């Protein structure tokens, strides 16, 4: 696989120093402002490999350019992001071992995963971590039209206080019957809860990884 084109990072399933066959693979896309090396992406990958799920992280081209130049830049338009995501999915299918494959992402990356999901024949389902239902403070600008007709299974893991879509807001949306939404108690867009809630970011990431693994296993075993 071309590292220069796709800038991938594979987290294999290891036990006692040996690489084991995963039960599934998750291709995970990053959010708008931070790439594959962000703490959330690395922590989630680490948790998921503990559930025997191989994780493929990558940077979109604009993020790869940011890493190389050290200069911040906005994400490319959705069309370009989706083209890259689809090409990466095809490349993984051609060059990696054949296991049930899922896609997902954090925030923007999760949205891109949901938009490519039904068009990607090799993909079983998707997981969105903190889906950006609308821009913060603009609940009228919904990004849900395609979610109303989604055919493949999707799990959305959302902080209850997420400013891109709170629990109260999301529960009122008309979403496809193939979509399941699970909430992290008192979590924000990064799943971080307030101290007085009694929860921690670490336990929420563990919980999100467990929910992801359960979702994947349920659809692998169908």
Residue ranges and their predicted role:
Residues 171, 175-222:
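C-terminal catalytic histidine-bearing segment of alpha/beta-hydrolase fold enzymes
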Residues 122-133:
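A conserved short beta-strand
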Residues 150-151, 156-158:
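Short beta-strand/loop motif that positions the catalytic acidic residue
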Residues 100-105, 129:
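Short beta-strand immediately N-terminal to the catalytic nucleophile in serine-hydrolase-like folds
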Residues 163-168:
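Conserved alpha/beta-hydrolase "acid-adjacent" motif
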Residues 112-116, 137:
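Hydrolases whose catalytic domains are alpha/beta-hydrolase-1, hotdog thioesterase
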Residues 2-100, 188-195:
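Serine-hydrolase catalytic machinery in alpha/beta-hydrolase-like enzymes
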């Amino acid at each position: 696989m071309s590292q220069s084109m796709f800038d991938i990072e594979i987290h294999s399933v290891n036990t006692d120093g040996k690489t084991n066959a995963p039960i599934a693979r998750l291709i995970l896309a990053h959010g708008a402002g931070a790439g594959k090396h962000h703490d959330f992406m690395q922590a989630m990958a680490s948790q998921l490999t503990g559930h025997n799920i191989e994780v493929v992280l990558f940077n979109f081209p604009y993020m790869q350019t940011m890493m190389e130049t050290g200069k911040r830049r906005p994400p490319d338009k959705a069309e370009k992001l989706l083209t890259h995501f689809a090409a990466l999915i095809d490349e993984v299918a051609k060059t990696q071992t054949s296991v049930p494959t899922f896609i997902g992402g954090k925030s923007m990356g999760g949205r891109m995963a949901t938009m490519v999901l039904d068009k990607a024949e090799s993909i079983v389902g998707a997981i969105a971590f903190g889906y950006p239902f609308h821009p913060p403070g603009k609940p009228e600008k919904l990004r849900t039209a395609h979610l109303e007709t989604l055919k493949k299974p999707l799990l959305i893991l959302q902080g209850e206080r997420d400013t891109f879509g709170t629990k109260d807001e999301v529960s009122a949306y008309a979403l496809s019957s193939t979509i399941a939404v699970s909430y992290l108690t008192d979590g924000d867009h990064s799943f971080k809860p307030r101290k007085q809630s009694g929860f921690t970011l670490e336990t929420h990431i563990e919980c999100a990884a467990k929910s992801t693994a359960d979702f994947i296993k349920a659809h692998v075993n169908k």
